[in-house]
Amino acid sequence: MDHDKTGCQSPPEGPKLCTNNCGFFGSAATMNMCSKCHKDMLFQQEQGAKFASAVSGTSSSSNIIKETFTAALVDIETKSVEPMTVSVQPSSVQVVAEVVAPEEAAKPKGPSRCTTCNKRVGLTGFKCRCGSLFCGTHRYADVHDCSFNYHAAAQEAIAKANPVVKAEKLDKI
C-alpha cells in the first residue's frame, strides 16, 4: 500500500511547449502544437493535397506532361546558369575606381574645425555662405569678416521675386 502512495504515480500533466519549438504552449487537441503552428501545418497539408490532385491523373498524357515539365525545368536551370557568367574587363574596373575617387575626396578626412580659431566643431559647426566652417562664436558674418556680399545677394533675390513690369508707352491722340 505504501508503494501505491509514494512514487509510482505519474506527475500531473502541465502545459507542454509546442512541438515546433516556437515558444508557445500546445495542446493534445492540436497534436501538442500551438494554434498558429497547427493552422500552418493544416494549410501546408491542404496545399500539398491540391497540388497532388492537380498533378496526378489517370491518363498517360499526364505522365507525359510531368516528364516534359521536369525536362523543361532542367533545361531552364541549365540555360539560366550560362548567361550568369560575366567577364570583367580592366576598363570597367578603372571607371569604377574613377567614380569612387571623387566621393572620397569630397569627404573631409579629419575632424571639422572652425576656420578662424581652429576649434573642433564636429556636428555643431556652422557653414557660412562664403564656404567656410565656423564655431558658435565666429558664425556671424561681422565676427569672421565674411567675404560674401549679403547686400548684393538680397537685391538679386528681390529682383528675381518681383520682376519690374513696364507698361508700353501710350500713343497720344
From Swiss-Prot:
Keyword field: Metal-binding, Zinc, Zinc-finger
The UniProt record gives the binding positions of Zn(2+) 2 as 114, 117, 135, 138
The record, for SMART domains, names: ZnF_A20, ZnF_AN1
**Which InterPro entries did the record assign?**
AN1-like_Znf (IPR035896), AN1_A20_ZnFinger (IPR050652), Znf_A20 (IPR002653), Znf_AN1 (IPR000058)
Q: Where are the zinc fingers (A20-type)?
A: 12-46
For this UniProt entry, the molecular function terms from Gene Ontology, in alphabetical order, are: DNA binding; zinc ion binding
Positions that bind Zn(2+) 3: 128, 130, 144, 146
Q: Which domain of life is it from?
A: Eukaryota
Mapped zinc finger ranges (AN1-type): 108-154
Q: What is this protein called?
A: Zinc finger A20 and AN1 domain-containing stress-associated protein 2
